[in-house]
Amino acid sequence: MIVPAFSQGLYGRLRQLAAADWQRYVAHPFVQQLASGTLAENAFRRYLTQDYLFLIHFARSYALLVSKLRTLPEMRAAAASMNAILNELPLHVGYCAQWGISEPEMAAQPEAPETLNYTRYVLDIGHSGDALDLLVALMPCVAGYAEIGLGLLQHPATRLDDNPYASWIRNYGDEGYLQGVSAALALLETVWQQRRSEARITELSEIFTTATRLEAQFWQMGLNAAAETRA
């Protein structure tokens, strides 16, 4: 199994600079409850519905990235990521159907504030910045989910038997997903080496950290659904 190099290159550096926020993201109570199988079903349903809307905007972000890259190999790599998301959507729809959520129902849902904040931030970075800025904004989701999936699969406290969320956990620790993440990190590093400038680290760190915080807020959105039901 190819394990992405989470601690290396520009990604590893930005991840370290965002260490406190990164930990709040990858070890969020939503993630911990996925691991234990104790997450409230309505919290997961809220997450799934909003994730469907999120993925549509994420595909648009990759389409924008293609237009900003310099070489055909780079453009092909970004296009492959976009196609992976577009091809993932029918699988996502099928998975949601198992939870009693239809695609028309998801498509008709308004975007939650957390979804709006996150997706529009990434798209704004893409429109106002260059390919490197946009790649950095995309990485907390792309690589973060792999780190979460692998971490949960390897953690002895994670419950996989009789856990309704086991297939979600396995999906993000799957070899196919990890290969895609490794390719995304390689593209990030290639673009960084083309534009390498220490003067940009502060700005790139701010983008990465902001996207990381928005990821944690996306988890919290799901947990808030359970709290709203109890209220």
Protein language model regions, located:
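A non-catalytic, amphipathic alpha-helix used as a structural packing/dimerization or gating element
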Residues: 46-57, 80, 203-210, 214
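Long amphipathic all-alpha helical oligomerization modules
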Residues: 174-208
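Alpha-helical bundle segments that constitute or directly flank the non-heme di-iron/ferroxidase center
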Residues: 19-24, 38-68, 87, 136-146, ...
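Secondary-structure edge/capping motif, primarily at the C-terminal ends of alpha-helices
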Residues: 65-69, 126-129, 152-156, 191, ...
